[in-house]
């Protein structure tokens, strides 16, 4: 897991503190399996009003993300569901089984004007459970059916499973795919974003997509001064060699409960860098 603990839910008047300082790690893992819940949402597109991103709507097939990226800015959204932004965000995943049908319903409305939709904003549409459920794949089929443009961002090599659909979308200039590459060091990504694809696998996905004619680039995201900023030249070089057509970066953001989670992670996994990172 990425988070070390569950932070208190800011909307919950009660908070339980464990009576042990250092829980047994194996026992803790046994007690924290990933649980999946049905999400009964009756709409599927979230409207974006921020001028900082280049799309008006996003689609999140899931809520929460088992990738476990400790820095994830979306963690506080789990608090609105009655969960913690900490381990709950990684272990209690809401699944929108009806997402493809709801998307088709939306695109069928006379009021809908085709425009770019992002997969995703607050989750990774290719997190591990997607391998079995194929909700993202079925959504891509709807995008293709209605010739609606889509932009995708992921940290998972599973995106290459859908190359057949992405090729068809690319032939109609309807898709862009971005792989987030935080570091080229597996030892770092293995604790920073533990259930994502490893760096070489993401770069291999870039190559596979580029060779298939799918527009693909990378995000150096998040950029964490004192932790991965010195890697930027090497990441850009590796991405260019892999076939990336563009590169962006996003500075780390630590809203709400994410800040204490990240600082706790630093002290646990990178104590020698904790002070440097906090003071940058």
Please place each PLM-identified region on the residue numbering.
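Residue-level detector of anion-binding/catalytic polar loops
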Residues: 149, 215, 245
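Auxiliary Fe-S-binding modules of radical SAM enzymes
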Residues: 1-40, 46-47, 230-280
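Conserved strand-turn element in the central/C-terminal portion of the radical SAM core barrel
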Residues: 184, 192-195, 208-229, 252-254
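Active-site glycine- and acidic-residue-rich loops that bind
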Residues: 157-160, 224-233
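Conserved Radical SAM active-site core
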Residues: 27-62, 70-178, 182-189, 199-206, ...
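Short, solvent-exposed amphipathic alpha-helical segments in soluble enzyme
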Residues: 167-169, 195, 237
């Amino acid at each position: 897991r990425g988070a070390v603990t569950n932070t208190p839910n800011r909307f919950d008047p009660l908070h339980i503190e464990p009576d042990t300082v250092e829980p047994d790690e194996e026992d803790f893992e046994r007690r924290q399996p990933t649980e999946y819940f049905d999400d009964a949402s009756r709409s599927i597109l979230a409207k974006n009003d921020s001028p900082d991103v280049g799309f008006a709507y996003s689609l999140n097939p899931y809520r929460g993300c088992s990738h476990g990226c400790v820095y994830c800015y979306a963690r506080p959204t789990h608090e609105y569901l009655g969960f913690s932004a900490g381990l709950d965000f990684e272990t209690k995943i809401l699944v929108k089984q009806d997402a493809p049908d709801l998307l088709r319903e939306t695109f069928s409305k006379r009021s809908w004007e085709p425009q770019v939709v992002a997969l995703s904003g607050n989750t990774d549409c290719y997190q591990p459970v997607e391998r079995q459920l194929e909700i993202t794949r079925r959504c891509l089929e709807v995008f293709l059916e209605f010739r609606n443009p889509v932009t995708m961002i992921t940290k998972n090599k599973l995106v290459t499973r859908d190359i057949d659909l992405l090729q068809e979308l690319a032939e109609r200039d309807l898709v862009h795919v971005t792989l987030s590459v935080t570091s080229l060091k597996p030892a770092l990504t293995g604790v920073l974003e533990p259930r994502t694809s490893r760096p070489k696998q993401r770069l291999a996905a870039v190559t596979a997509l580029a060779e298939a004619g799918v527009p693909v680039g990378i995000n150096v995201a998040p950029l964490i001064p004192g932790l991965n900023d010195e890697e930027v030249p090497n990441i850009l070089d590796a991405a260019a060699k892999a076939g990336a057509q563009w590169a962006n970066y996003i500075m780390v953001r630590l809203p709400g409960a994410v800040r204490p989670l990240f600082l706790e992670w630093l002290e646990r996994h990178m104590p020698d860098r904790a002070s440097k990172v906090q003071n940058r």
